[in-house]
Design a protein with these regions (language model features):
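Start-transfer (signal-anchor) and selected internal transmembrane alpha helices
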Residues: 1-45, 242-246
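Membrane-interface helix-loop-helix junctions at transmembrane boundaries of multi-pass membrane enzymes
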Residues: 232-242
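Membrane-embedded helix bundles of polyisoprenyl
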Residues: 123-141, 145-230, 243-247
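Alpha-helical transmembrane segments of multipass membrane proteins
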Residues: 30-38, 159, 207, 250-255
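Periplasmic/ER-lumenal interhelical loops and adjacent helix-loop junctions
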Residues: 250-286
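Membrane-interface starts of transmembrane alpha-helices
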Residues: 19, 23, 110-122, 144-152
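Membrane-water interface at transmembrane helix exits
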Residues: 35, 39, 70, 105, ...
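Membrane-interface coil-to-helix junctions
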Residues: 34-129, 158-159, 163, 168-173, ...
Length: 286
């Protein structure tokens, strides 16, 4: 994962692009091996009996909403389906279908007539990128070497909040947060604000179409990057304002187009799914 616009992976001394690629591939391989140990091949391919009737309510919601969305007509907002809660319908962004992948799957279905369960490959992708993204962050802080790549992958793949998210599929995409942190530190430590700001801006907007929880964190990191940019990169306030305006306009446009502002919900679960002192350490039971 060499960021275009950077100087040989970062602005810091590097072992060379080949060594960087090898380190990233190794981190991704470790993640895929762990995924293969924890899940059967059919689960990772999105096929087999597991996906016919998952035991987890969240997964049932993901799958059923995705199927309704794929088989419905094209509408606006883009992710609106009237096959759920007719006649008004609902935007499936609220049903955790991973809107970006759902959009590609719907295009494929309309063109070919074949449905694709993208949740299985998504699990494999998240496991591959979990360690890779953490390595990207560590390299942004100056870490180099093959052994550190292995250590980074193992640490990232051992995080309880990641391992316990497999039943809430979209929140497996924690690599988005880690990559954004890596871009932030490359901007700050390497004094490459403009290049990294563009990449961080794009990542933040893409994350809207994956999960809004992740977007809130990724967008917060991007806001911090812009603040650093404004304070340190003198003479480029206009660029900072342009990037900020693009981010705000892009965010509003995506929220409207995807259906985040469509309809209204209730407060079911408020106060029940709450935060307490054990949650960061034992999130599945607190």
């Amino acid at each position: 994962m060499v960021v275009p616009g950077s100087q040989d992976d970062t602005a810091f001394p590097a072992q060379g692009r080949g060594a960087a690629v090898l380190a990233y591939l190794l981190a991704a391989l470790i993640g895929l091996i762990l995924a293969a140990v924890l899940f059967t091949p059919t689960v990772l391919l999105g096929t087999g009996p597991f996906w016919d009737a998952p035991n987890y309510p969240d997964m049932q919601q993901h799958l059923s909403a995705a199927r309704y969305f794929l088989h419905d007509s094209w509408r606006f907002p883009v992710f609106l389906t009237r096959l759920i809660m007719p006649p008004d319908g609902v935007s499936v962004v609220f049903l955790d279908v991973n809107p970006l992948l759902a959009l590609f799957a719907k295009i494929w279905f309309k063109l070919t007539g074949f449905t694709v369960n993208y949740f299985g490959p998504w699990i494999a992708l998240c496991y591959a990128l979990q360690g890779t993204a953490f390595l990207f962050l560590c390299r942004s802080l100056g870490l180099r070497g093959v052994v550190p790549a292995v250590v980074c992958a193992v640490i990232a793949l051992s995080v309880p909040e990641f391992l316990y998210r497999y039943f809430h599929l979209n929140l497996l995409g924690q690599f988005l947060i880690t990559i954004q942190l890596g871009l932030y530190f490359r901007a700050v430590r390497g004094d490459r604000y403009r290049a990294m700001s563009w990449w961080a801006l794009g990542l933040a907007l893409i994350t809207i179409l994956i999960h809004f929880y992740l977007f809130a964190i990724v967008a917060g990191i991007y806001a911090a990057l812009l603040a650093e940019y404004a304070l340190r990169a003198r003479g480029e306030i206009r660029t900072v304002l342009v990037h900020g305006a693009i981010f705000v306009i892009g965010t509003i446009a995506l929220l409207v187009a995807s259906g985040y502002l469509h309809g209204a919900g209730g407060s079911t679960g408020f106060g029940y799914f709450s935060m307490n002192i054990l949650s960061p350490f034992v999130p599945q039971d607190s």
